[in-house]
Amino acid sequence: MNQLIIRAIEERFKKSNIPDFKPGDTVKVHVKVKEGDKERIQVFEGVVIARRGGGLRETFTVRKISFGVGVERVFPLHSPIIDKIELVRRGDVRRAKLYYLRTKKGKEAKVKEKTDYQKA
């Protein structure tokens, strides 16, 4: 009974405009940033290295290299601070968690592009 109530409440807060992306895919996450009384959109582009959780509590981790330094950011999937998520390219990987990319440098850290998929 409690599960049904929780699931019904969670359905109201879930976002519907989330693209189907997996670890290895390159995404652009448009994040709302509040500075003082102003609000603007900041784009964070990188490779999805993990997705975890489920339902309303699902999160995903995006990694990018900025000025030679690896930057990772964890985003709640259904958070109101996320304006939109754009899928840039599909990655061809065989793992669900790509934490091994943290130790790779330069071209080693590249994820191969998947060629046999249908673009939406």
Curated annotation (Swiss-Prot):
PROSITE patterns: RIBOSOMAL_L19. Keywords: Ribonucleoprotein, Ribosomal protein. InterPro entries: Ribosomal_bL19, Ribosomal_bL19_CS, Ribosomal_bL19_sf, Translation_prot_SH3-like_sf. The keyword Glycoprotein does not apply. SUPFAM superfamilies: Translation proteins SH3-like domain. One of its GO terms (cellular component) is cytosolic large ribosomal subunit. It holds the Pfam family Ribosomal_L19. GO terms for molecular function: structural constituent of ribosome. The keyword GTP-binding does not apply. One of its GO terms (biological process) is translation. HAMAP family: Ribosomal_bL19. This protein is located at the 30S-50S ribosomal subunit interface and may play a role in the structure and function of the aminoacyl-tRNA binding site. Belongs to the bacterial ribosomal protein bL19 family. This is Large ribosomal subunit protein bL19. It comes from Thermodesulfovibrio yellowstonii (strain ATCC 51303 / DSM 11347 / YP87).
